[in-house]
């Protein structure tokens, strides 16, 4: 059985917490997660989500207080001898359906498309990985007719940095992530809206501790 505790804090003095417990039952994984809202005033079902997942095949999430299901089905087919990873995602509560596909041309090059059925919006992304160290990802948003750009890379072993820029909103972002079995995982996110006159940066810190039970 595996468990995880996650905490998040930002400069606006907003804080949140979450806990997840997962264990294997044959070839499927069962998972339960709660948030700090579950115990904010008194113990309740607020924030409780139950899930069952078969990696690479399907996952079903059930939000207990909202009585809302989220389904995801995955499959891989081959196109011109290249793997095409497909996903169908449907959220019952807001009646939202997403179709997602990623064509893995080789270990360094991937092309993906994400289509929202209800809105008709489509995003196209190309991902290039250079020598397993640096990844460059331009994304085109068809509805907004705009581009997003992201560059990420590994530094100092367990650490990685990611810089991003959204041309439609003019938001510049920077992430520092560490994934370590010894010290746990944490992420520092900073962003600034270049379209704002004052350009006040936003900063948040997220930490995750993983346990084997």
Curated annotation (Swiss-Prot):
The chain crosses the membrane at residues 2-11, 18-27, 32-41, 55-63, 70-79, 93-102, 108-117, 122-131, 144-155, 159-167, 170-178, 202-211. GO terms for biological process: regulation of monoatomic ion transmembrane transport. Keywords: Chloroplast, Ion transport, Membrane, Plastid, Plastid outer membrane, Porin, Transmembrane, Transmembrane beta strand, Transport. One of its GO terms (cellular component) is pore complex. It is found in: Plastid, Etioplast membrane; Plastid, Chloroplast outer membrane. Residues 12-17, 42-54, 80-92, 118-121, 156-158, 179-201 are chloroplast intermembrane. Residues 1, 28-31, 64-69, 103-107, 132-143, 168-169, 212-213 are cytoplasmic. It is a multi-pass membrane protein. Present in roots, shoots and leaves. The keyword Chloroplast applies. The keyword Lipoprotein does not apply. One of its GO terms (molecular function) is voltage-gated monoatomic cation channel activity. Belongs to the plastid outer envelope porin OEP24 (TC 1.B.28) family. Homooligomers form large rather nonselective pores in plastidial outer membranes. High-conductance voltage-dependent solute channel with a slight selectivity for cations transporting triosephosphates, dicarboxylic acids, ATP, inorganic phosphate (Pi), sugars, and positively or negatively charged amino acids. This is Outer envelope pore protein 24, chloroplastic. It comes from Pisum sativum. The lineage of its organism: Eukaryota, Viridiplantae, Streptophyta, Embryophyta, Tracheophyta. The gene is OEP24.
């Amino acid at each position: 059985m595996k468990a995880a505790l996650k905490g998040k804090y930002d400069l606006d003095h907003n804080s949140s917490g979450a806990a997840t417990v997962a264990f294997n039952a044959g070839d499927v994984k069962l998972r339960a997660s709660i948030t700090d809202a579950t115990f904010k005033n008194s113990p309740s079902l607020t924030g409780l989500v139950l899930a069952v997942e078969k990696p690479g095949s399907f996952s079903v999430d059930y939000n207990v207080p909202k009585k809302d299901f989220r389904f995801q089905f995955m499959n891989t087919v081959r196109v011109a001898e290249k793997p095409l990873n497909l996903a169908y995602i449907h959220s019952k509560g807001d009646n939202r359906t997403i179709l997602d596909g990623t064509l893995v041309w080789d270990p360094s090059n991937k092309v993906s498309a994400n289509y929202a059925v209800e809105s008709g919006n489509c995003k196209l992304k190309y991902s290039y990985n250079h020598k397993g160290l640096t990844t460059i990802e331009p994304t085109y948003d068809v509805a907004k007719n705009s581009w997003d750009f992201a560059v990420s890379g590994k530094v100092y072993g367990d650490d990685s940095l990611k810089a991003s820029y959204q041309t439609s909103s003019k938001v510049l972002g920077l992430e520092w992530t560490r994934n370590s079995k010894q010290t746990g995982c944490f992420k520092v996110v900073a962003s600034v809206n270049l379209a704002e006159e004052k350009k006040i940066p936003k900063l948040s810190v997220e930490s995750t501790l993983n346990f084997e039970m």
